[in-house]
């Protein structure tokens, strides 16, 4: 997806339970652990 008024998706790194994740368009942090995405409910438990 793209951000409103922008041509390209925006991503930035963020902290996910001590692991690197990505925030897309100032949305919630999206986390990776190995090859597996951490489910949103699991991420909530890390905060």
Curated annotation (Swiss-Prot):
Belongs to the neurotoxin 03 (Tx2) family. 06 subfamily. It is found in: Secreted. It comes from Phoneutria reidyi. Keywords: Disulfide bond, Ion channel impairing toxin, Knottin, Neurotoxin, Secreted, Toxin, Voltage-gated sodium channel impairing toxin. Transmembrane segments: none annotated. GO terms for molecular function: sodium channel regulator activity; toxin activity. Disulfide bonds join 3-17, 10-23, 14-46, 16-31, 25-29. The keyword Secreted applies. It comes from the Eukaryota. Its main location: secreted. The keyword Protease does not apply. Blocks voltage-gated sodium channels (Nav). Causes rapid general spastic paralysis and death when injected in mice at dose levels of less than 2 ug per mouse. Expressed by the venom gland. InterPro entries: CNTX (IPR035285). GO terms for cellular component: extracellular region. The presence of a 'disulfide through disulfide knot' structurally defines this protein as a knottin. This is Delta-ctenitoxin-Pr2d.
């Amino acid at each position: 997806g793209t951000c409103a008024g922008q041509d390209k998706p925006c991503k930035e790194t963020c902290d996910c339970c001590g692991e690197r994740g990505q925030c897309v368009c100032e949305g919630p942090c999206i986390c990776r652990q190995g090859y597996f995405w951490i489910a949103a409910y699991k991420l909530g438990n890390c905060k």
